[in-house]
């Protein structure tokens, strides 16, 4: 069912509450990466260019104490947003009370207001975590500030918080509209089509440290994928399940039986490394050696080897849909990044396929290579995109009205 989208709304003269994802890295008041702010611009611009008043809510980081509040204020984000929009943005250093209500009442059509970090509500009270615990009274209060609600925060779509599900529930309860923003719409389109209606051959590439993080994804995508290519630390649990020697490699001993089950269920769909780049210690300076699918006792696998890269590329060259989540090795160390970077290059060369990247390290690899413009879609949600690939219902999407 198609969701109600921001451009289905008549925003002129209306106060539009927008849950954005401004959870960006900030150190000493300086934003390290503004991609999430940039990703929210189309929705914000639509509202203000059509005469709406945009009231923006977001969390930033994990707020555990008053000491965190200085580092986790959204003030620098509001300043950066003002630069990107090339117009003034009002920052309100609170998200509840008279100061907030006055700022909103003083808005003119086309104005933008950013309220303070929603997670300050997790410590500013005697009621426990009001925001991340989805306190209905907080959701109702925030909903009372606007005429309609737009959820554009895919990064928190797998969570039921007061600032997404709480507001949407209260809005709908009052006969008001709750719609998806353009970013949420894009995520639903690309991830939804890949999971539910992929063009074949459909290749899933999974990496990262733990099998346990990806069990749901593998189970959901075995019947849908033509191939599931596995690299990263999780590959060694699968290799151990096949009876290979894995030396000192990272693996989950308690998941070996599960890996065997997944291998049996998948048949020949799961493709594992046939060689590995190994070292005696987890260090960029350690001497490297290419070994087969058995790793010597004194060594650990830290990247996929050249034969595996060639094998994976050969499978990818015919793909029409590709979803990649997780690095192929210890990507943070340049000497063990080649597998991840080569997979990124292979995806960039697929001109006749839909390519989707999710997860922090895979996304970082795409940026490092400068291939982002050649990728169909880079997901803005780590946990949310994994949950979506598992086939789970995401509360932040479910709370938005259908057309």
UniProtKB/Swiss-Prot annotation:
Q: What is its main location?
A: cytoplasm
Pathway it works in: Carbohydrate degradation; glycolysis; pyruvate from D-glyceraldehyde 3-phosphate: step 2/5
Which EC class, in a word?
Answer: transferase
Question: Would the keyword Nucleotide-binding turn up in this protein's UniProt record?
Answer: yes
MF (Gene Ontology): ADP binding; ATP binding; phosphoglycerate kinase activity
**Residues that, per the record, bind substrate:** 21-23, 36, 59-62, 119, 159
Assembly description: Monomer.
PANTHER family, per database record: PHOSPHOGLYCERATE KINASE (PTHR11406), PHOSPHOGLYCERATE KINASE 1, CHLOROPLASTIC-RELATED (PTHR11406:SF23)
What family does this chain come from, according to its entry? Belongs to the phosphoglycerate kinase family.
Q: What is this protein called?
A: Phosphoglycerate kinase
